[in-house]
């Protein structure tokens, strides 16, 4: 399963390259959507900007989900639903198909801040928040293909759901400890 993509909440984490481009209505030149190519796992994503509603609850779920966006000043805010259940981390924090994600894209010159806020009523007791900075690199039409090699990274018993009892999660304050917060 290692070459199968993570869900969208984890797709932007780590070193990667991605592209964003506009999809315009040919008659009006209004932006209908932003298309996103995420080099890791070669995923293509659409962020609909035309005001369309999210599909009904029983509609198919995908690793990339169904996304709609709106501009608030200089910030693009994206809401994603219909995300296939997967994991938030390689260590095994699971996600459910009730996961929703709100993203904020904020550009500062050649830097792009990407902030996600994930809610999951099944597995999360509070929102999962993560952020990452990207640097604009002008490489013309060059992009990398994702070469996947299968390796056993985290051996897991397929009959168990990874979990920690209340107060026993060793990852709860890992970032605070690492950065002395």
What residue ranges belong to the model's regions?
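PEST-like low-complexity, intrinsically disordered acidic/proline/serine-rich tracts
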Residues: 1-181
């Amino acid at each position: 399963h290692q070459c199968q993509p993570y869900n969208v909440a984890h797709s932007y984490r780590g070193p990667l390259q991605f592209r964003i481009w506009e999809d315009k209505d040919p008659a009006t030149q209004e932006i209908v959507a932003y298309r996103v190519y995420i080099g890791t796992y070669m995923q293509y994503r659409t962020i609909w900007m035309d005001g369309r509603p999210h599909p009904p609850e029983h509609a198919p779920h995908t690793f990339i989900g169904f996304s709609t966006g709106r501009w608030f000043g200089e910030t693009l805010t994206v809401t994603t639903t219909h995300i296939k259940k997967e994991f938030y981390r390689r260590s095994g924090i699971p996600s459910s198909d009730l996961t929703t994600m709100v993203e904020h894209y904020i550009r500062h010159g050649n830097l792009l801040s990407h902030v996600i806020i994930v809610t999951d009523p099944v597995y999360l007791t509070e929102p999962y928040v993560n952020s990452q900075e990207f640097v604009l690199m002008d490489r013309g039409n060059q992009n990398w293909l994702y070469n996947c090699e299968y390796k056993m990274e985290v051996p897991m018993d397929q009959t168990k759901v990874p979990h920690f009892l209340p107060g026993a999660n060793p990852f709860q304050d890992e970032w605070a400890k690492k950065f002395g917060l």
